[in-house]
Amino acid sequence: MTNTLQFKEFSSFVNISFWHELSNKKLDELKLSEESIPLNGHYTFSPSQQLDPFLCLEFNAFLRNNVTNSTENQYVLPPRSYLSHGTLYNYNTVDDFKQSPKIKLFNDASKRIWNDINNGNIDKDTSLLNRFILLTYADIKNHQFYYMFGIPALLPSQPIQQFTEKPESINIESLKSFSNQILPQYFCLKQQQQESSTTTTTSFELIGSIEEKGNQYLNECLENDLIPLVGFCDPCSLPLNPGWPLRNFLIYLSIKYPMLKKIKVLCYRGNGSTSNSILLSLELPSMGEQLIKKQQEEDAGEWSGKSVGWEKDSNGKIAPRFVSLASTMDPLKLAEQSVDLNLKLMRWRVMPSLELEKIKTTSCLLLGSGTLGCNVARSLMSWGVRNITFVDSSKVSYSNPVRQSLFTFADCSPKAKEKSIAAADALKKIFPAINANAHVFSIPMPGHSVPQSEYQSIRNTIELLENLIKQHDVIYLLTDSRESRWLPTMLSRAHGKLCINAALGFDSYLVIRHGIKDQCQNELNPSISSKLGYQGSDLGCYFCNDVIAPTDTLKDRTLDQMCTVTRPGLSMMASSIAVELLISTIHHPYGGRAKGETETDVYVQGSTPLGIIPHQLRGFISHYQTLPLFSNPYKHCTACSDYIIDEYNSKGFDFIINVMNDSSCLTKICGIDDLKNTEVNIDWDIDISDDDDDNNNNNNKEKNDDF
């Protein structure tokens, strides 16, 4: 009596980590590519009758097998698991996914199995019998995925029959020899019977894997007219049916050994407290017809056999499946991935060379948390900057929230919050993963004298400011007075930090990138330096056009001078330009030491993928005009000249205290006073040597007054 053998198909089990890995790979590597990608899946034998046979994909499914280079990561199977070779086809749109050539792709996978059987690859690696294809569409913006699994099983010319009524159950004692062994995927074994006076016991012993011992063992059985006994690790738990991996294995045996008519198969399902392993007695169909068909395929170049294996949905239909991870993901991780999404999409087509990691790891110190500080912080976050520190000494007032984008009415009522703290808190509410810090202190300023009793407090403030500048990559000067920018300008120059200054007028703005003192200039080849335009240290600072020292401009101000009186849209323009200037600078090989460019022709290629890197930009909203300008550093600058830096390095705190109490010492130290005296003497000499009229003398007096 015979009955047709039926097999239990695989169900897919895709770990959430796989979808995360696919999203990252799509964003960072695949982009718009729809090329096929090799995958690794695995299954395990089933020790439980309650579990379906699962084909599993984990986070490491994209790693390679048989890696010889030690620097590459290799796919490692979980314990007691077996390999299945897959191919991923990921599509860019849901329509492409729906219209994909599913039948052709499935037949291609079937043909690979068939070819591996006939060209001898299976003799070396039986895991090639287990292949699958995965078709996907990844909606990474909404964290939704559509997918279809195909796990091909070749169909024989006739159904495979059992020559027993039902499979034979295996006693747990018979499998004791397997308890401490790691079994191969497919293997051959022998069955031994031991008789006693009362009972007959059966045991199974492993001979070896099909790759190592299969050919010798099966040929010996054919020569001696014996029924071979082979086995495989079965992921199925049904008492009457084997799992899917047996199908192609039987096809392989039928083709490899055409004289083999009967065979016994142990479906090994683990060695737990009880055994649900079964022993099948099978009749193999002749595969002669398929061998003839194979020759026809080689002539035609197409696969013409039949195969089955599409995974069905919950309704038993061959249809795409759908999974949404939005509800299962950590909201913080979800936000972080979504924040990076638009930035990474820029690299797909528009700008593949975008250095997002450099941007992400750049730390920014924002001195000033008002109108400019709030808008700069928002723009930095939009570019993916993760480390922002605010410094400010004032509190949020009722007039601030409408102009300063990080504040709300709650920040000034019922009790006003410190601006820097409120700004940092606002960033964390917008994006919890950001590293936003705040410090509350007033920056020491030239001409703002302090009593000796406050010297220690001022010293602590200066040390804190200097440490913050050392700890950050970029310093933004966004304060509301000119003199408050002097100390950060000087410290940034002294410590070689990129400093970007943004300042507002009523209908104009200035964004300037300060030059960085080149400490390694002597090590560069002068010819190379000249050729590449290595002029980063030849950029003036905010104070380089001054011939007077910064002094107290806050005293005796009227109300309209104390408040920020500018056209409201101006701060957003200046802030965005200040941030874009930083991003362009990051992409230059020399970073902050890049030369200043003034090219305005949009058809001329800039020095970075993002375009030119200007030294300064002056905008005039009255004429809707922005001008890229360049100015050399002033040798006698009151903030960035070597005279000032050397004085600070030698005297430190005492120098700053002197400047605070009497800012005129700056013009003396940097040499401006000497220049003035020289100019006066030159004019005086000219007046004596030239017998000019009184009109000339009056002109000279006006020139002197300009200083």
Curated annotation (Swiss-Prot):
SUPFAM superfamilies: Activating enzymes of the ubiquitin-like proteins. One of its GO terms (molecular function) is Atg8 activating enzyme activity. Keywords: Autophagy, Cytoplasm, Protein transport, Transport, Ubl conjugation pathway. InterPro entries: Atg7 (IPR006285), Atg7_N (IPR032197), Atg7_N_1 (IPR042522), Atg7_N_2 (IPR042523), ThiF/MoeB/HesA (IPR045886), ThiF_NAD_FAD-bd (IPR000594), Ubiquitin-activating_enz (IPR035985). Disruption phenotype: Impaired survival when exposed to pathogenic bacteria S.typhimurium associated with the accumulation of S.typhimuriumin in large vacuoles which fail to undergo autophagy. It comes from the Eukaryota. One of its GO terms (cellular component) is cytosol. Homodimer. Interacts with atg8 through a thioester bond between Cys-563 and the C-terminal 'Gly-120' of atg8 and with ATG12 through a thioester bond between Cys-563 and the C-terminal 'Gly-124' of atg12. This is Ubiquitin-like modifier-activating enzyme atg7.
